[in-house]
Swiss-Prot record:
Root EC class: ligase
Taxonomic source organism: Enterococcus faecalis (strain ATCC 700802 / V583)
Assigned protein family: Belongs to the tRNA(Ile)-lysidine synthase family.
Catalytic activity: cytidine(34) in tRNA(Ile2) + L-lysine + ATP = lysidine(34) in tRNA(Ile2) + AMP + diphosphate + H(+)
Keywords: ATP-binding, Cytoplasm, Ligase, Nucleotide-binding, tRNA processing
Protein name: tRNA(Ile)-lysidine synthase
Annotated GO CC locations: cytoplasm
Xref: Gene3D superfamilies: HUPs
Length: 462
């Protein structure tokens, strides 16, 4: 087994001469086999091995096993690190919490030692268990390949050089090499799904097909090749199509709608992998199905799907936008417009009611902002009020003809977010005279004989 292990490791670049490599060792047959193999490799390649052990303190034998490893490393002049896991809530999310603790410890050891590689002893049976668990619990295509043989980690790489070997082969290697290893009796219990698969399901599958583990290895490789191919096709187009915004990202709808559902699925999967996954936001298959339904619904120009952590994917006419929504509701505010003065409606919006016969110095910071003007004839009933839109708002567009403000927004294809933030200016009778950026009321149009006393100036920072 050693020569096969050594040859493949050299070909795959699992190590380089004189490297420092951290080997995660639990004391079980798989990790002791890995340590034994790497000790032999180290002699040939002048490697510096560092052993990292986590004492989970879940069994009475844990302390004895840790002591054995400490003595083992001392006798062989191997650098040895050990830590103990203290968990006051032993029964809640035990596996996940222990795993997080282990890898944080391994990361610290790598940083201390300046190691380029962390090696763990995952084997082919582990791969089969992992793939079955993902299928049972539900997974998407990008995660269906199971455990990766290598990936970036901490100051270098995490490599699993035993991933092609069945556990039975490791037992045979242990018998030939006659090294000491420990059996974890908790692995024989069926409390956890992984144990039930290991003890009950895998033996039946191997009985049905003695080559089952080889089939798992082939399946995993084919899945990974397919994922890499799809990624190579999608990545250049992803970089070209996705535009960053202040709140997130957006994609031109036309770019996606001309593609097949299969392309849309993998494009969006890659998009989320690049944007949301690094933020700790995950999507399930139900959400992806809902997203594709909203995307391709020709009857609805707008639609949205809520995701974790207040993230929302929204279709809005020409764009598909991914943004994190604020949890707080919009504050209902009303401002009375004082002639000859201006007010900041927000950090990027300013409104002033300016007399035509008096100079009015604008705040210096808004001079470069985009502006809109509306003349206010003397016949306009004052005072004027500014507020956000309300349900049932109507605006007079022609004599005797009013239109719902909501319909004005729809006709102009105004996104929902812009509708909610739009400002409405009303006269003393609460008639809408202006919706800056969107609509002027017929009531605001001065007659030739009207005298203009004021102008409304609306400034926005784009």
């Amino acid at each position: 087994m050693f020569w096969q292990f050594y040859k493949r490791g050299k070909e795959q670049g699992f190590w380089q001469p004189h490297q420092t490599i951290v080997v995660a060792v639990s004391g079980g047959v798989d990790s002791m086999a890995l340590l034994t193999l790497m000790e032999q490799v180290a002699e040939k390649e002048q490697l510096q091995l560092v052993v990292a052990h986590v004492n989970h303190q879940l069994r009475e034998a844990s302390a004895q096993e840790a002591q054995y490893l400490a003595t083992y490393c001392q006798q062989r002049e191997l650098t040895y690190y050990e830590t103990r896991w203290e968990d006051p809530e032993k029964q809640r999310n035990l596996e996940a919490k222990a795993r997080t603790f282990r890898y944080e410890f391994f990361k610290e050891v790598m940083e201390i030692e300046g190691a380029a590689v962390l090696m763990t002893a995952h084997h082919l049976d582990d791969q089969a268990e992992t793939i079955l668990m993902k299928l049972i619990r539900g997974t998407n295509f990008s995660h269906s390949a199971g455990i990766k043989e290598r990936r970036p980690f901490a100051t270098g790489e995490l490599i699993r050089p035993l991933l092609i070997y069945p556990k039975e082969e490791l037992y045979q290697f242990a018998q030939r090499q006659a090294f000491v290893y420990f059996e974890d009796e908790t692995n024989q219990t069926n409390e956890y799904l992984r144990n039930r698969l290991r003890n009950q399901v895998l033996p039946l599958l191997k009985q049905e097909n003695p080559q089952f583990l080889d089939q798992i290895a082939s399946f995993s490789n084919e899945q990974r090749f397919a994922q890499e191919f799809i990624q190579e096709q999608i990545e250049p187009q992803l970089s070209e199509a996705v535009e960053p915004t202040k709140q997130g990202w957006r994609i031109p709808l036309k770019r996606l709608l001309k593609e097949t559902p299969a392309y849309q699925h993998f494009f969006l999967t890659a998009f989320f992998q690049k944007t949301l996954v690094p933020l700790g936001v995950s999507l399930n298959q139900r959400q992806m199905t809902q997203i594709l339904k909203v995307l391709n619904d020709e009857r609805q120009p707008q639609g949205s799907v809520m995701l974790e952590q207040q993230w929302q994917l929204a279709k809005s006419y020409d764009w598909l936008c991914l943004e994190q929504k604020q949890a707080a509701l919009r504050e209902e505010v009303t401002h009375l417009l004082v002639p000859g003065a201006g007010i900041y409606l927000s950090e990027t919006e300013w409104l002033g009611l300016i007399a035509t016969d008096k100079p009015f110095p604008l705040p210096e910071e808004i001079n470069q902002w985009t502006g809109q003007l509306l003349a206010i004839p003397l016949t306009t009933a004052t005072p004027l009020t500014v507020r956000h839109r309300q349900s049932g708002d109507r605006i007079t567009l022609k004599p005797g003809f009013t239109k719902k403000l909501s319909r004005v927004f729809i006709d102009q294809k105004v996104p929902n977010e812009a509708r909610e933030s739009a400002w409405v200016i009303t006269d003393e009778q609460e008639e809408i005279i202006w919706v800056p950026k969107f609509a002027n009321s017929y009531l605001s149009i001065p007659l030739e004989t009207d005298k203009i006393h004021y102008r409304l100036l609306f400034k926005t920072k784009e």
